[in-house]
Amino acid sequence: MNQVTISNLMIQMKDEPLSEDLVRHMVLNSLRSYKTKFSKDFGELVLCYDDKHCWRKDYFPYYKQNRKKARSESSLDWNELFDILTKIQNELEENFPYKVLKINGAEADDIIAILSNKISSTPNLYEEILIISGDKD
């Protein structure tokens, strides 16, 4: 979910200062839009989040190094942004009717893959799945 938000922020913010209220507004607006557009055909929203410490980094030390370099060259305060995103994630989990999934050591992609595999391999269960992601992989 954070990658979707970050993708939207990069398009919307341009040179505006980072604002917790703006980020929250964008997240809630996006979720409302997805629910309105897709809930009839795809059911409820399940929000998947990356854990801060991914298992891939243990095996591939240079995993996401390009991202780290790009962030260091950016004027955006990435620590502040991730703090805001974590706060909003907690608010969603505590105050909204969405299923919020975050698993120690896993990325959202891992969670999505396991859920998709489980649904597609369950006998007599056919369910359309829509995945919305800001990831490029």
Task: Label each region the model flagged.
Residues 1-132:
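Noncatalytic, basic helical substrate-engagement surface that gates or grips nucleic-acid strands
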